[in-house]
Amino acid sequence: MLDFEQLSPAIPLQSVLCVGDLMLDEFVYGEVSRISPEAPAPVIAAQRSEIDVGGAGNVARNIASLGARCVFIGLVGDDDAGRTLQTTLAKDALITPVLVCDPSRPTTRKVRFVSEHFSTHMLRADWEVAAPASAAVEQQLIDAVLKQLPAADIVLLSDYAKGVLTARLIRETIDAAKKLGKRVIVDPKSPNFALYRGATLLTPNRKEFCEATRSRADSAAEIATAAREAMDVADCEALLVTQSERGMTLVVREGEAIHVPAHPVKVRDVSGAGDTVAAVLAVMLAAGADWDIALRAANAGAAVAVSKKGTASVSLAELRRKILPHAFLAAEEKIVAAGGDLAPHLAEWRAEGFRIGFTNGCFDILHPGHVKVLTAARAACDRLIVGLNSDASVRRLKGETRPVQDERARAEVLAALEAVDLVAIFDEDTPLRLITEIKPSVLVKGGDYTREQVVGHEVVAANGGEVLLIDILPGHSTTSLVARAQNGKS
């Protein structure tokens, strides 16, 4: 958990050079309720259609949606589909499209007809020329790669066998990358893994792996054995076999094979899941992840992708929610930063008829006195909001040596308590603004205050609420704890 969190800030600093076969994906959704009288074929009553960037372009979209920068090099025809792809990719501020135009071939376009009700693909129609790029076009692609390579942190080759990744382009890209100390990830299509010799990582799916190794790949042990032989052929550091519902198996040259099971999710569409895996691996490895962290992140990314319709991209927030423990996320979601929006929470709770309570404090070092007040406050309401003084507010109230813990740490400790439903950080000296916004049914403070001394008591009373004073536990205060710690006492 902590490793992923530590790596996340580095992701926006990474740049991935992605090279591969670009496609325009179109999805036609409709209802199927009858068979054609002209032939034994279902009739789809088309209701809507969507277009998206597919193939290696979807890898680029995933890289950008994760927050990294991507320079994408691909091939299009001189047609509407190619212009649509150029325009669509250019709209993403994190993607720099470098597209070579070949008027002699159409832009690869795939149209899928999908039953809306059953989320079932009925038919796919392809417009494409899968032949390798001509020598002249190939040279343009290679020139583009060599120009962009020095600025990249990692290289990703996405091979759909549509003509971009010729043997010469692959060879020149890998050789140039190795000279510059850049790692190269290849999502291969050819069963001849020797084409990708010298790459850092190959990511075939199970079918591709079986074809390349002539292995049944029925177990992690069998995959590991066949993978090591394939790694000798490809002279690569690692090989990852994606296996859909079976999960993923990573074999590294130095170390044991690692298998991770697939996340249990409802599969809506597998289109582009492999693109997501490749993108997550590239971004995580570029950011400094080790093999294990990168593998688990890619596995989580695949789970998010297959739970979406169409050609899916995965955001860093979605990846984070899938990777991090539920309890960690649940606590984090309880925290509202200073100036944040409380309205959605308040509206939801009021719609349910919940009695909302409020208390506040600095909570610099949580102690039994705090816990008693919070527990009693929660017992007096259905949902408890805790107002938390920001670091600046604490310094003004307690002096320059406080707080001992910053506001984020204090908020996370409070949010982890079952008694607390929401933590709202405020910058002012008092929580009057928060109380005025929340209008709690019950306002709770420790018993060392009188009712008239409690900030916001007038607001609460004017709205029909009550002020509840809780007897404090003697001998417990943050100030005394800090003083005792400074004096070396326990």
Curated annotation (Swiss-Prot):
GO MF term list: ATP binding; heptose 7-phosphate kinase activity; heptose-1-phosphate adenylyltransferase activity; phosphotransferase activity, alcohol group as acceptor
Annotated stretches, region: Cytidylyltransferase: 358-490
CDD domains per UniProt: RfaE_like (cd01172)
Classification via PROSITE patterns: PFKB_KINASES_1
Ribokinase as annotated region, ranges: 1-330
Record pathway: Nucleotide-sugar biosynthesis; ADP-L-glycero-beta-D-manno-heptose biosynthesis; ADP-L-glycero-beta-D-manno-heptose from D-glycero-beta-D-manno-heptose 7-phosphate: step 1/4; Nucleotide-sugar biosynthesis; ADP-L-glycero-beta-D-manno-heptose biosynthesis; ADP-L-glycero-beta-D-manno-heptose from D-glycero-beta-D-manno-heptose 7-phosphate: step 3/4
Record InterPro entries: Bifunc_HldE, Carboh/pur_kinase_PfkB_CS, Cyt_trans-like, PfkB_dom, RfaE_dom_I, RfaE_dom_II, Ribokinase-like, Rossmann-like_a/b/a_fold
Keyword DNA repair: no
Keyword Nucleotidyltransferase: yes
Residues that hold ATP according to the record: 205-208
Catalytic activity line of the entry: D-glycero-beta-D-manno-heptose 7-phosphate + ATP = D-glycero-beta-D-manno-heptose 1,7-bisphosphate + ADP + H(+); D-glycero-beta-D-manno-heptose 1-phosphate + ATP + H(+) = ADP-D-glycero-beta-D-manno-heptose + diphosphate
EC number: 2.7.1.167, 2.7.7.70
Keyword entries, A-Z: ATP-binding, Carbohydrate metabolism, Kinase, Multifunctional enzyme, Nucleotide-binding, Nucleotidyltransferase, Transferase
CC terms in the record's Gene Ontology section: cytosol
Assembly behavior: Homodimer.
HAMAP family referenced in this protein's UniProt entry, alphabetically: HldE
Family, as annotated: In the N-terminal section; belongs to the carbohydrate kinase PfkB family.
Database matches in NCBIfam families: cyt_tran_rel (TIGR00125), rfaE_dom_I (TIGR02198), rfaE_dom_II (TIGR02199)
Role: Catalyzes the ADP transfer from ATP to D-glycero-beta-D-manno-heptose 1-phosphate, yielding ADP-D-glycero-beta-D-manno-heptose.
Protein's name in the database: Bifunctional protein HldE
Species: Rhodopseudomonas palustris (strain BisA53)
